[in-house]
Amino acid sequence: PTKRYYLKIDAASKAADVKVNGQVAGSHAGGYSAFILDVTGLIRENNEIEITVDNARRDITPLWADFTFWGGIYRDVWLITTPEQHFNMANYGSTGVFVSTPVANEREGVVQVKAEVTNDADSRIRLKMQNRIYDAQGKLLQTNAQPFSLKAGETATVEYKSDVIDNPQLWTPEMPTLYRVVTAIVNAKTGEVLDEISNKIGFRWFSFDADKGFSLNGKPYKLRGVNRHQDQAPVGVAIDD
C-alpha cells in the first residue's frame, strides 16, 4: 500500500487489547501512557475497532496509590494516515521528533532536533529534513534543509542543530514564552512534504543547590507543590475537549 494506517490511543486504564475487524492489532499495559498500533494490513472500507480495557490487573504499575484507579478509555483515540515515508510511529506513542535546547541563556539559544524517519517503501528514496524556527510572535527566525536517503524498510535518526539565536526570550512561569519548531520530511525529487510535526519549546535553564535551593534562569525561584489528583467530578480521569 502507498499509505500507512496507525491507531493511537492516548490512554486506556490499565490494560488494553485491540482488534480491528476481528483480528488482533496489539495490546498495551499501562494506564497513563499513549500507544500506537500499525493497523495498515487490517483496515478496509468499513471497519470495526474493538478495544477491551481491564482495570483489575494488579501487576501493572502503579501497584498501589491513595487514589482510585479508574478504568476505560479516558483520552482521545486517533486514526492516523501517513505516506510510506514518515516520522517513526513505533517509539512508545511519541511523534518520533525530539526537540531540545542544548544552549539556553539570556545571550544565546540553540535548538537541536533528533527525528526518527521511516521508509516503508520497497526501494531507496532521497529525502530532506526541513526545520523552521519561529519566535513567540510567529516570525520566522531560521530555516534549514538537509538531504539524506533511506533504504527500503529502514528507520534512521536524522539530527539538526540550529545556528545561534541571539538574545532569546526566556521562559518563566510568569512569562511562559514559547518558540515553535516545525520539522518536515520532504521528497528531495518532487519537493512534496510527506510528514510534518510542530513542537513548542521554551528557552530556560535550572539548577539545584543544597544552600541556595532551586534556581530558574540563574535566579532563586520558590517552588510551590500542588497536591492535585487526576480526578474531577463528574468525569473522573477523563479529559474533555
Q: Across the structure, where does each feature detected by a protein language model lie?
A:
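Accessory beta-strand-rich segments of carbohydrate-active enzymes
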Residues: 1-90, 94-96, 120-121, 136-140
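Short glycine/proline/serine/threonine-rich loop/turn segments at secondary-structure transition edges
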Residues: 2-4, 43-46, 124, 164-180
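Beta-strand-rich binding/interaction modules
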Residues: 20, 107-149, 156-161
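Hydrophobic/tyrosine-rich beta-strand signature of extracellular beta-sandwich/beta-rich modules
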Residues: 51, 131, 181-183
